Amino acid sequence: MSVSAFNRRWAAVILEALTRHGVRHICIAPGSRSTPLTLAAAENSAFIHHTHFDERGLGHLALGLAKVSKQPVAVIVTSGTAVANLYPALIEAGLTGEKLILLTADRPPELIDCGANQAIRQPGMFASHPTHSISLPRPTQDIPARWLVSTIDHALGTLHAGGVHINCPFAEPLYGEMDDTGLSWQQRLGDWWQDDKPWLREAPRLESEKQRDWFFWRQKRGVVVAGRMSAEEGKKVALWAQTLGWPLIGDVLSQTGQPLPCADLWLGNAKATSELQQAQIVVQLGSSLTGKRLLQWQASCEPEEYWIVDDIEGRLDPAHHRGRRLIANIADWLELHPAEKRQPWCVEIPRLAEQAMQAVIARRDAFGEAQLAHRICDYLPEQGQLFVGNSLVVRLIDALSQLPAGYPVYSNRGASGIDGLLSTAAGVQRASGKPTLAIVGDLSALYDLNALALLRQVSAPLVLIVVNNNGGQIFSLLPTPQSERERFYLMPQNVHFEHAAAMFELKYHRPQNWQELETAFADAWRTPTTTVIEMVVNDTDGAQTLQQLLAQVSHL
């Protein structure tokens, strides 16, 4: 009997079962203990294979692939700390709804807690973050193949969002020629091998429920808050709010076109918050709100009803409003709750939004990060997409720009970490095949620097803007102690990215003005390669410009 041959047959059942649940992209890191899984994936023609030497980046690559494809994406890693490196991507997926299938190879039980190399306690190591966790036994013919495939089917068939951790112990030998060991075990699944359906068919229950009193509430004074959603949903929400005559406060990730732009500025004006107090109902569609003033208003508002509609489960309301948490697909929910044509009830807010935008435009000429945030919509590629990093950059775009309705925008705004942003952007580009503009800060770029290796493989032009303000300048917006701010918060690194781009053979530009930036863009969009554009700016100018605009708009 060949242990290595049966390991591979066991793994082949697992991998084939994944294909029945829409898995097409599979991300693989190098490793020996994962050999049965890797070879089974390599032999299965249903998969598109992606590889990376860094498991943390690999997890985020899978996250980006899942964001665009809307399908589960599988990840294969070897045992030990390689598994732990998947934690950040798993956490993010749990908060933003992407489906990740983590296949983690493991040592067999007799090698755990006895000093064996690269052997750690892997079952349960992700605690409550996976939606499902499966600790498989060591491969054995004593367990029927139908148990293995139905176990996989149960976890994936009931998966609505988040990650599944499948821990797969394999005993040595891991290498060897295939023979007939386990062939009859494998063949007991019969014509399942020629079928394309799961062995066990289950489906998560997610049905939009109509609110029977909607006809009553839609005649009231309402406010629509739009969080993270798809491009198509964003366009529908904008039209829905316009028909109702309700003001729409759109997040940078809402893709609604933000009809009342610069909300993070005008929400700091007492006239705006006073007018919003007249709202009898707030309907929030989508979660993960960005703007500080929006979150402050959300926490303090007290309408008669506060509804949150999102297909992700959980409360999603840090302010704990009295109201309704409606778990539903946004587009489906809108169909069940049609708008009734009414005149807009807000008068002051549209005027403030226009004046706030004019205040931003008046400052657009200086070459800085706040001005770049405002101008970013001028640089979006046609038929493309935008990936926005975290920390200061996403807040500036949210506050100072007005992205077009229906233009795809992606980000990691679940746990809002700066780890894995370049890797996620790489996955977003690969899954879509579209021209992509990605924008991150210098610390975010440093954090995921080896992901530049992933950006060597793009199918359409990708431009990575690194806004180099020499540290974590978001802390300039916070009341951090002045005496310790630079050393313990900003942590300036005094680096540039020309040599990093050269190491991975990526094109590089460092423009000094808007004309040079536009020339760099024009060159970048011509070829299906990655271009790194480093925009070096004065350290605190972006944060200071935002603070000045907030003060100016608050007194309009």
Swiss-Prot record:
The keyword Manganese applies. The keyword Ribosomal protein does not apply. GO terms for biological process: menaquinone biosynthetic process. Pfam families: TPP_enzyme_C (PF02775), TPP_enzyme_M_2 (PF16582), TPP_enzyme_N (PF02776). Induction: By isopropyl-beta-D-thiogalactoside (IPTG). Keywords: Magnesium, Manganese, Menaquinone biosynthesis, Metal-binding, Thiamine pyrophosphate, Transferase. Its EC number is 2.2.1.9. One of its GO terms (molecular function) is thiamine pyrophosphate binding. Its cofactor is Mg(2+); Mn(2+); thiamine diphosphate. Gene3D superfamilies: 3.40.50.970, TPP-binding domain (3.40.50.1220). It is an enzyme of class 2 (transferase). It comes from the Bacteria. Disulfide bonds: none annotated. It catalyses: isochorismate + 2-oxoglutarate + H(+) = 5-enolpyruvoyl-6-hydroxy-2-succinyl-cyclohex-3-ene-1-carboxylate + CO2. Pathway: Quinol/quinone metabolism; 1,4-dihydroxy-2-naphthoate biosynthesis; 1,4-dihydroxy-2-naphthoate from chorismate: step 2/7; Quinol/quinone metabolism; menaquinone biosynthesis. Binds 1 thiamine pyrophosphate per subunit. Optimum pH is 7-8. NCBIfam families: menD. Homodimer. Belongs to the TPP enzyme family. MenD subfamily. HAMAP family: MenD. Catalyzes the thiamine diphosphate-dependent decarboxylation of 2-oxoglutarate and the subsequent addition of the resulting succinic semialdehyde-thiamine pyrophosphate anion to isochorismate to yield 2-succinyl-5-enolpyruvyl-6-hydroxy-3-cyclohexene-1-carboxylate (SEPHCHC). This is 2-succinyl-5-enolpyruvyl-6-hydroxy-3-cyclohexene-1-carboxylate synthase. It comes from Escherichia coli (strain K12). The gene is menD.
